[in-house]
Swiss-Prot record:
Family named by the database record: Belongs to the NPY family.
Keyword rRNA-binding recorded: no
Gene3D superfamilies in the cross-refs: 6.10.250.900
Pfam family name, one: Hormone_3
Protein's organism: Gallus gallus
Cell location: Secreted
Purpose of the protein: This gut peptide inhibits exocrine pancreatic secretion, has a vasoconstrictory action and inhibitis jejunal and colonic mobility.
Protein name as catalogued: Peptide YY-like
Keywords: Amidation, Hormone, Secreted
Keyword presence, Secreted: yes
Molecular function as annotated in GO: hormone activity
One Gene Ontology cellular component: extracellular region
Residue positions where Tyrosine amide is found in the record: 37
Length: 37
């Protein structure tokens, strides 16, 4: 029932891709923790 976890951009990712990944990851964590409580 959890949303899919964002994929890690990998070692060759650009700074923009990494920033996008971290914002997606933060959003994902918010969704997961909100569902639990």
């Amino acid at each position: 029932a959890y949303p899919p976890k964002p994929e890690s951009p990998g070692d060759a990712a650009s700074p923009e891709e990494i920033a996008q990944y971290f914002s997606a990851l933060r959003h994902y964590i918010n969704l997961v923790t909100r569902q639990r409580y």
